[in-house]
């Protein structure tokens, strides 16, 4: 259980409690649970991911950004991704790739000790449909439009199979939350089996409606 990555991630109050309650299902499955810590600065992983994302997204966005008739049709976040990509040099991207490799080595070492790594699926509960994205979580400002989803980049950067399963409902409004089950590289079947076993153990409540929708 990696939780909030040793207090690095901004997490809304109630999220960790909801997820940690769901973790008890793994104990009922016969698994041994431990709190763990990644031996790598998560901010380095974020910086690498952000640069690589700028480059990847820009390949789709730049044709529209360069078209005067379509530029203004792009949402601000898409334009920002492409404009940030234009500031990157080849050296920047090589450094980001090297950082990703360093992160991968540290991440994979965790599987010397564990079969699966568990993280929250999100850093905050569902928010109002009129809110484009959370500008803050607790006292911490989100400095990009996807910073509130930082918790999902680790499976992406490592290339490890990951699945999200329901963790229950939490927070003052009883909103849904999930946990990520992340396995070793190419261990997709193991991850699916773990998710299936989890859902069988959680069968009592997994199909229940959230509190806000109950009669």
Per-range role (PLM):
Residues 31-49, 80-83:
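Short connector loops at secondary-structure junctions
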Residues 47, 95, 127-149:
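Short, surface-exposed loop/helix-turn segments at secondary-structure junctions
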């Amino acid at each position: 259980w990696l939780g909030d990555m040793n207090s690095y991630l901004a997490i809304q109050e109630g999220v960790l409690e909801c997820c940690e309650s769901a973790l008890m299902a793994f104990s009922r499955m016969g698994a041994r649970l431990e709190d763990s810590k990644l031996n790598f600065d998560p901010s380095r992983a974020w910086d690498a991911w952000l640069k690589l994302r700028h480059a990847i997204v820009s390949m789709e966005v730049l044709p529209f950004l360069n078209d005067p008739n379509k530029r203004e049709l792009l949402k601000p976040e898409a334009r920002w991704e492409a404009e940030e990509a234009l500031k990157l040099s080849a050296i920047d991207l090589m450094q980001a790739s090297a950082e990703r490799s360093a992160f991968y080595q540290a991440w994979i070492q965790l599987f010397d000790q564990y079969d699966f790594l568990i993280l929250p699926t999100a850093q905050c509960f569902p928010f109002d449909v009129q809110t484009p994205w959370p500008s803050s979580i607790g006292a911490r400002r989100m400095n990009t439009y996807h910073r509130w989803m930082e918790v999902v980049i680790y499976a992406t950067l490592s290339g490890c199979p990951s699945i999200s399963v329901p963790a229950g409902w939490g927070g003052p409004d009883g909103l849904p939350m999930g946990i990520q089950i992340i396995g070793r590289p190419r261990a997709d079947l193991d991850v699916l089996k773990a998710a299936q076993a989890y859902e069988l153990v959680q069968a009592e409540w997994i199909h229940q409606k959230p509190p806000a929708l109950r009669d």
